[in-house]
Amino acid sequence: RAAGRAASSVLEMIGEHVQPGVTTEELNQICHDYIVDKLDCIPAPLNYGGGGGQMPFPKSICTSVNHVVCHGIPSSSKKLKNGDAINIDITVIKDGYHGDTSKMFFAGEGSVMAKRLSKITQECMYRGIEQVRPGARLGDIGYAIQRHAESNHFSVVREFCGHGIAKVFHDDPQVLHYGRPGTGVMLEEGMSFTIEPMINAGKRQIKILPDQWTAVTKDHKLSAQWEHTLMVTADGFEIFTLRTEENFG
């Protein structure tokens, strides 16, 4: 809970800094300093992964701009332009627990399509969250997300999913953002996991860039993502990463 609140506070803090002309490395540095100095937390992505020939993730946040689906690496050469859509993904470790959350921002005025994709993607996340209660199944979550995305003529990325989270960053269960109702793991009180749909304006296919992390849409059309960390409660759910701006839950 404390880790979730800490992570959501980073997203609340960084919004005013997302402006045309800022680099994604500058956003990374602002978030890193805030996480470490203000919150006394650890940025979980920094040096995460590696092994199997993959380099560890070199930065403290993920910055995924426009057609980048997820895991964009902050760079001093990536300057935001007016109209750019950017997902900022924050994971912090507080007292051994992880809080993981992301949201979409716009540098200046986003395009009509980017704003619509972002809005529908956030709605997809909320539709998924609304399924969460003891006795529901993971397929119910995936189905709710997929149905809302596809009914708006968007597509669901299948290579990445939500995940169990607590003392481990990525744990079981795998929370797919597509599926059939009544299938998959049954939810039980006390389970904690993320719901983090990645929705594409075009086709769902993606590819990984040579940096081994950055995922982009194959057709170069826009992608959006929103994410919360939540827990199954006796009568539903509690979102650990809810922000004050949200009227949900």
List each language-model region with its residue ranges.
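Active-site neighborhoods and metal-handling regions in enzymes and metal-associated proteins
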Residues: 1-249
